Regions:
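Conserved protein kinase catalytic core
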Residues: 49, 104, 161
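Conserved kinase catalytic-core helix
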Residues: 67-77, 106-141
């Protein structure tokens, strides 16, 4: 695992990296991600420059690397990180890593919905929560299906690690996150796949027993409505 202290690279070196791959959407004047032909990815963070920004003291790239370490310790599949860099005299940090094998759930929903196993996917979310892991920005685009019933995570800059299973209220908020994406929900419905929320609720019923299911689903609906 690369050090949390980035290697300083020149602007020329950065340009060589940028021109060697396919650029993703631009953010703060730089591509958020670069996809390379050798199945590696370069993720970029153009650090916020405000004095009160926490990224001044703890860059997002460092959080990403640390989260990868902690997730691996919990048995979660994450990309193998290759290098950690910062452009000289600049606020841009970069992390290069090997792509996880497989396809995102989002890709599969569009092109091969028959390969999506909703019960096992719901179980994966449940297992994360039981381990005390809250991936705040989780959605079907950053959950990778490595093989049937086997998953991994990408783009995990913002993750919390609790020392106990995630409380139900926070689980509901987390489950609401992927259900805010209308195109994903549309694909789920059009593919006649089992309902994702119902699959998660069924796991809760079997493992937790009595809980306020109405309050749980109400929290999810409120979160979805708030963000839509």
């Amino acid at each position: 695992m690369p050090t949390h202290t980035p290697e300083i690279i020149s602007e020329t070196t950065y340009q060589e990296i940028a021109t060697s791959g396919k650029l993703g959407p631009t953010k703060h004047g730089y591509p958020a991600v670069i996809f390379h032909a050798n199945d590696t990815v370069t993720k970029l963070w153009a650090k916020k420059t405000g004095w009160l920004s926490s990224s001044r003291w703890r860059p997002y790239s460092t959080r990403f690397i640390k989260n990868a370490e902690l997730l691996k310790q919990e048995g979660i599949h994450t990309p193998e990180i290759i290098s950690h860099m910062r452009i000289a005299r600049n606020h841009v940090h970069l992390v290069q890593y090997h792509s996880l094998p497989g396809k995102s759930i989002r890709e599969l929903l569009v092109h091969h919905p028959e390969q999506v196993d909703i019960p096992s996917l719901a179980q994966y979310f449940y297992d994360l929560h039981e381990k005390g892991i809250i991936f705040r920005a989780i959605h079907f685009g950053n959950v990778i299906q490595i093989s049937t019933g086997k998953y991994g995570l990408i783009d995990f800059t913002d993750v919390s690690f609790l020392k106990y299973p995630v409380p139900l209220t926070r689980r509901a908020a987390n489950i609401a996150t992927p259900l805010r994406y209308r195109e994903d929900v549309k694909c789920l419905k059009e593919s006649n796949l089992p309902d994702f929320l119902e699959a998660y609720l069924e796991i809760l019923r079997k493992n937790i027993g009595d809980f306020d299911e109405n309050a749980f689903t109400r929290t999810i609906k409120e979160r979805i409505k708030k963000r839509s």
